[in-house]
Amino acid sequence: MIIRPETSHDHEAITQVTLAAFTGKFSDHPTEHLIVKGLREAGALSLSLVAELDGHIVGHVAFSKVTINGEYQGWYGLGPISVQPALQKQGIGSTLIHEGLVRLREMGARGCVLEGDPNYYNRFGFKSYLNLIYKGAPAPQYFMAHPFYDAVPQGEVEYHPAFYVSL
């Protein structure tokens, strides 16, 4: 398996992987593929990695800048992340996350946030912090941060407007 940055030739495959990964998971009409498209079109897709297996895109992870208290402070949001359903639970998503976090550090990021299952994301160094909030999280424990160098900032996190897309 190869982990590499997306190219313009990967866009349709990324859309298909994302749709396959999210259809029926939370909704029969997922919007995660539209988030990726919106970030890309706005020039806000800071890091976009694909997992390629035998010449096929089987996974994808996106990272984009977030603001804290209305300011960019060197923090990024992880997501969406998707893996072809037939290949899930085989380490592809974990590899994408690990590689993405390494590359964010190399880019000078101060940390990364995400909304997701703490039982999964804790293994990558993510945890909830009472003073860093995202109002869109279903419960506080589902919004987590992974500081790379400093203490976690305090305040409210806001994702790029592409995250608030609806069908």
Language model: regions and residue ranges:
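Conserved beta-strand segments that form the floor/walls of ligand-binding pockets within enzyme
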Residues: V50, A62, G77, S82, ...
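A conserved beta-turn-beta hairpin within the catalytic core of GNAT-like acetyltransferases
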Residues: V66-L78, Q88
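Active-site rim helix/loop that mediates acceptor-substrate recognition in acyltransferases
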Residues: T15, F22-T67
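Conserved acetyl-CoA-binding loop-helix of GNAT-fold acetyltransferases
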Residues: L78, V83, K89-V102, L114
